[in-house]
Amino acid sequence: MKKASLVGAFFVSIFCSLQALAFCPSPGTLPLVGVAKVVDGDTLRLVDGRSVRLIGINTPELGRDGRKAEPFAVAAQRRLRALVEASNGRVGLVPGRESKDRYGRTLAHAYDEQGRNLESALLAEGLGLMVAIAPNTALVACHRRAEQQARQSRLGVWRKLTPRSTRAVRQGGFALLQGMVERVEHNRGGYWLEMEGPLVVHIPPQAFSAFDLAQLPRLAGKTLEPRGWLVDRRGRAGTGQARWMLRVTHPAMLGLPR
């Protein structure tokens, strides 16, 4: 029975991945570039020396500096490597509107030889979480569908992953959270959604165009499922302010109630 269950899960994973490959089709014929190395589940090193951080996905971290790999980190790396190999070691790239990150890596969407999006394939198998960081949000809708498919089927990280309570925030890094909005503040620095526990979600002014601003004050009392990178403000937050901050630049990262 257990073997049958595993076999069934395997075919569900393959079926979901095949569906997801059609979620974000290539915008046209792309020049293909060689991949020298799959660094991890969301980073490639090209033969021309560039490092490429895939847009729209955050995969589990590999072990380094004495830390163990996060669950499914190795699986994500292996799956991305397999997708690249199936594309004869070459990918097409569509750079984001913001083309570099703070580490100097190229920010881009990657496609195989058939024009199928690699991020959506990984998301549909539950090998990463969707992220939406303005201005690189062109494929948010199809990436969300791919993730939702994996979540509903409990694939990959979604077998055990559940949102952590905002009351339980204790360390930085990427997190999927859940909690109630206690209060919404607005000032020159943006909108501040004060959550249960030691967390505030910050929407900066430059991101306002992506949000329905009239709806933000009405989120007080609602439960959200925000995700993103937690910043420790200890020593910088004022008296009575939350220690932890999560900066959001697109509504998809808020986990708004449906």
Which sequence ranges carry the predicted segments?
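Positively charged N-terminal leader segments that act as targeting/secretion signals
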Residues: 1-10
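Small beta-barrel nucleic-acid-binding modules, primarily SNase/OB-fold domains
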Residues: 18-258
